[in-house]
């Protein structure tokens, strides 16, 4: 790695960290973060190392944060859950449309709900 590449990495870190408040978790997906790193003229291994380093430094992971589901939607999901704790793919898609969520969000919500119920019974 030459001096210019190290300077580019330093600048990338400053750019990424300037978007955080008091070194807190980034609340938006890491798109900006990846965009800056991908624009650097360094080898893929160095990009991945930089991605991990900055991620650890700012407390983020390379995935999107969970979304908050409003009370009305939670109530609807809870009603469905009371009837049936495991949904088929078709049922999951139907519930997702009704709740304005993705089928994946519904699947994860149901999985988390089952775990929460299991833990409260213990």
Curated annotation (Swiss-Prot):
SUPFAM superfamilies reported for this sequence: Homeodomain-like
Pfam annotation, one family: Homeodomain
Keywords: DNA-binding, Homeobox, Nucleus, Repressor, Transcription, Transcription regulation
Cell compartments where the protein resides: Nucleus
Highest taxon listed in the record's lineage: Eukaryota
One GO cellular component term noted in the UniProt record for this chain: nucleus
Keyword DNA-binding annotated: yes
Quaternary organization: Forms a heterodimer with ALPHA2.
Miscellaneous comment: There are three genetic loci for mating type genes in K.delphensis. MAT is the expression locus that determines the mating type of the cell, whereas HML (containing HMLALPHA1 and HMLALPHA2) and HMR (containing HMRA1) represent silenced repositories of mating type information. The mating type is determined by the MAT locus, which contains either a copy of HML or of HMR. Diploid cells are usually heterozygous for the MAT locus.
Annotated family: Belongs to the MATA1 family.
General function of this protein: Mating type proteins are sequence specific DNA-binding proteins that act as master switches in yeast differentiation by controlling gene expression in a cell type-specific fashion. Transcriptional corepressor that acts in conjunction with ALPHA2 to repress transcription of haploid-specific genes and of MATALPHA1.
Entry protein name: Mating-type protein A1
């Amino acid at each position: 790695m030459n001096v210019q590449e190290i300077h580019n990495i330093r600048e990338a870190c400053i750019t990424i960290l300037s978007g955080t408040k008091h070194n807190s978790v980034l609340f938006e997906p890491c798109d900006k973060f990846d965009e800056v790193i991908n624009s650097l003229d360094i080898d893929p291994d160095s990009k991945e190392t930089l991605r991990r380093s900055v991620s650890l430094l700012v407390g983020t992971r390379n995935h999107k944060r969970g979304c908050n589901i409003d009370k009305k939607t939670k109530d609807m999901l809870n009603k469905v859950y009371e009837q049936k704790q495991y949904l088929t793919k078709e049922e999951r898609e139907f519930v997702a449309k009704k709740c304005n969520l993705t089928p994946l969000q519904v699947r994860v919500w149901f999985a988390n709900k089952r775990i929460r119920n299991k833990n409260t019974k213990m």
